[in-house]
């Protein structure tokens, strides 16, 4: 008598799996396109049929630019996966990220991305904490980044800026080749935030010892997006493990080095007005050392990489618009006689500088895509449209800021749209300023803006 196990050979199992998988996949595709609750939303049918297209776009780093093109074609809301919608409408910011009567801390977060951002710690960080802990941690860190706290650190900040400028002059004098300003901005700002947080610089501009640590910090955000994408396809993570080995090695390097720097700072028992000192002194807020450890990696990233991107973009756009650069030079030099006059206290009433910073964050957003939220059951209304529960939703800043629905001549770097509100050439009456949220909105917006 033939036993059932004799028939269950590997070829038989593979054939059975294939016969079952193919019709199942066809049924899923048909359902996603024709019967899914999101079937009426515009977007490419290929992306509506499966999560594979958006998965591959995230893996190759093309998702944000593709979303911008899709919004230009399909409008203010695009279905980019069977259960995923991207928005650009101004009202979507409030509907997705702001508080409401039903959701005091906005629509619940999609935690896979945030956990990947924060690393594997036993205690929650600002981006992974529950509502109550988040409010407590945010109050504390907001004070650490207040104007008063930053003013106390102003001499240290100026010291790092002066060092960067001297380094750039030295590099320019030593070579006839172009100097990579973005590289030096990243190094200088990462050095600065480490000094502000741990009370000790890394000397990245002069010493290459810790540059691998600085480079590793730049992959945390994009790798978090990849980890979120891989969560939908566990088998892909196994298959792609050899390719992603270096990415995960750099992640380990970043988190472990941050831990070591924090441990060294805590063991020093010295007093210095840095962020760690501020936090350890705040005993009334009941912040634990484990929570400080969980948040330290985030502070490094938030205080360096995005600022370097914004400054690089500003320099590039000013060089491409020499007439604006000339106006900005006149504004700065008419206000400050010497470099020592440039202080936080004196950096007021500079409308063109303020407008240039706002405009570069629109044209070249440092954070081109916002983390997604997961719509609770049974659903919510976003930008005037009903969205079923279980849908991943977000605003794509790059697409929103470059949308002709929101901004007049959106591809043009035009600082005057932020301060010149009169005259026939004014952008004021043509732009939807509520669509401009470079630091997001709501209880989880950027505390370091």
Segments from the language model and where they lie:
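N-terminal membrane-proximal hinge/A-helix region immediately C-terminal to the signal-anchor transmembrane segment
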Residues: 2-137, 159-163, 167, 188, ...
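Conserved, non-catalytic sequence blocks in retroelement Pol enzymes and Pol-derived host proteins
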Residues: 38-42, 56-61, 147-151, 266, ...
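Structural signal for hydrophobic/aromatic residues that build the beta-strand cores
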Residues: 43, 70, 80, 89, ...
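Conserved cytochrome P450 K-helix E-x-x-R motif and the immediately C-terminal K′/meander segment
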Residues: 57-67, 340-383
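Cytochrome P450 heme-thiolate monooxygenase catalytic core
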Residues: 106-118, 152-311, 327
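Cytochrome P450 heme-thiolate "Cys pocket" and heme-binding signature region
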Residues: 123, 143, 297, 302, ...
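Conserved cytochrome P450 K-helix/beta-meander segment immediately N-terminal to the heme-binding cysteine loop
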Residues: 269, 377, 381, 395-427
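Cytochrome P450 catalytic-core helices
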Residues: 306-331, 449
């Amino acid at each position: 008598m033939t036993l059932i196990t004799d028939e269950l050979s590997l070829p038989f199992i593979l054939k059975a799996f294939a016969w079952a998988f193919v019709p199942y996949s066809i049924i899923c595709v048909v359902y996603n396109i024709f019967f899914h609750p999101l079937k009426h939303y515009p977007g490419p049918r290929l992306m509506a049929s499966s999560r594979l297209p958006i998965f591959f776009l995230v893996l190759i780093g093309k998702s944000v630019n593709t979303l911008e093109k899709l919004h230009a074609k399909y409008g203010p809301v695009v279905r980019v996966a069977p259960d995923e919608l991207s928005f650009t409408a101004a009202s979507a910011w409030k509907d997705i990220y702001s508080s409401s009567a039903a959701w005091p801390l906005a629509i619940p977060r999609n935690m896979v991305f945030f956990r990947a951002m924060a690393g594997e710690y036993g205690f929650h960080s600002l981006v992974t904490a529950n509502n109550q802990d988040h409010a407590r941690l945010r109050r504390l860190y907001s004070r650490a980044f207040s104007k008063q706290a930053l003013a106390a650190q102003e001499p240290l900040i100026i010291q790092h800026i002066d060092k960067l400028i001297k380094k750039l002059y030295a590099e320019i004098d030593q070579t006839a080749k172009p100097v990579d300003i973005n590289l030096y901005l990243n190094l200088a700002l990462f050095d600065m935030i480490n000094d502000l947080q741990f009370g000790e610089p890394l000397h990245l501009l002069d010493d290459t010892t810790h540059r691998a640590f600085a480079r590793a910090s730049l992959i945390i955000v994009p790798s978090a997006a990849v980890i979120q994408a891989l969560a939908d396809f566990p088998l892909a993570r196994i298959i792609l493990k050899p390719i992603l080995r270096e990415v995960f090695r750099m992640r380990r390097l970043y988190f472990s080095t941050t831990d070591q720097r924090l441990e060294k700072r805590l063991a020093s028992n010295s007093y210095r007005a840095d962020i760690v000192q501020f936090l350890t002194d705040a005993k009334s807020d009941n912040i634990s050392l484990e929570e400080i450890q969980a948040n330290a990696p985030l502070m490094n990233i938030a205080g360096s990489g995005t600022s370097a991107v914004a400054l690089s973009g500003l320099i590039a756009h000013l060089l491409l618009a020499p007439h604006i650069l000339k106006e900005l030079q006149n504004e700065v030099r008419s206000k400050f006689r010497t470099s020592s006059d440039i202080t936080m206290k004196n950096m007021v009433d500079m409308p063109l500088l303020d407008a240039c910073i706002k405009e570069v964050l629109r044209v070249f957003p440092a954070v081109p895509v916002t983390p997604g939220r997961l719509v609770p059951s049974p659903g919510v209304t976003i930008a005037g449209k009903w969205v079923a529960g279980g849908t991943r939703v977000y605003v794509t800043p790059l697409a929103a800021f470059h949308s002709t629905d929101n901004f007049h001549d959106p591809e043009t770097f035009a600082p005057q749209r932020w301060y010149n509100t009169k005259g026939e050439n004014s952008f004021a009456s043509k732009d939807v300023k509520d669509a401009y949220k470079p630091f997001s909105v709501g209880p989880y917006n950027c505390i370091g803006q």
